[in-house]
């Protein structure tokens, strides 16, 4: 498994341990590449064809043939993060960006464990569908 990430990325901080456990459980070697030093690799796995979102986990066969890849966070987190943002702005219409970011981090931190479980489920489904 190839993983792209950076130490400062919130999703990387939340997701790296989960990815390491997945690799360990599956008996996979995990190689980590800093995104900002490997734009050539990162450009192959842009989210929605434009965003350098991390972490990215890329799965290969033993022969190094591509199987599939997973980017950033589970779909459930994407939906909930959007809802959290809307809720914060509705509660505080004049909130500045710094306070907004702080409030969003506080609320998303409470969901991290559930999102890790959702990530594992998503990875299982993705791999099962890709290996058929």
Where are these regions (language model features)?
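Thiol-based oxidoreductase modules, predominantly thioredoxin-like and allied folds used
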Residues: 2-7, 19, 27-42, 52, ...
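A short secondary-structure junction signal
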Residues: 14-15, 68
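Flexible, glycine-rich phosphate/dinucleotide-binding loops
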Residues: 10, 39, 76
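Non-globular targeting/processing and membrane-anchoring segments
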Residues: 20-25, 29, 44-53, 62-132
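Conserved redox-active cysteine motifs that mediate thiol-disulfide chemistry
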Residues: 7-14
């Amino acid at each position: 498994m190839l993983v792209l990430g950076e130490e400062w990325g919130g999703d990387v901080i939340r997701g790296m341990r989960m990815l390491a456990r997945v690799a360990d459980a599956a008996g996979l070697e995990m190689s980590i590449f800093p995104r900002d030093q490997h734009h050539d690799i990162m450009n192959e796995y842009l989210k929605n064809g434009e965003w350098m979102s991390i972490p990215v986990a890329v799965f290969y066969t033993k022969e190094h043939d591509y199987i599939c890849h997973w980017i950033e966070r589970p779909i459930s987190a994407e939906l909930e993060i959007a809802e959290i943002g809307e809720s914060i702005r509705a509660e505080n219409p004049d909130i500045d960006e710094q306070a907004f970011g702080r409030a969003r981090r506080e609320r998303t931190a409470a969901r991290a464990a559930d999102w890790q479980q959702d990530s594992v489920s998503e990875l299982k489904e993705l791999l099962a569908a890709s290996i058929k």
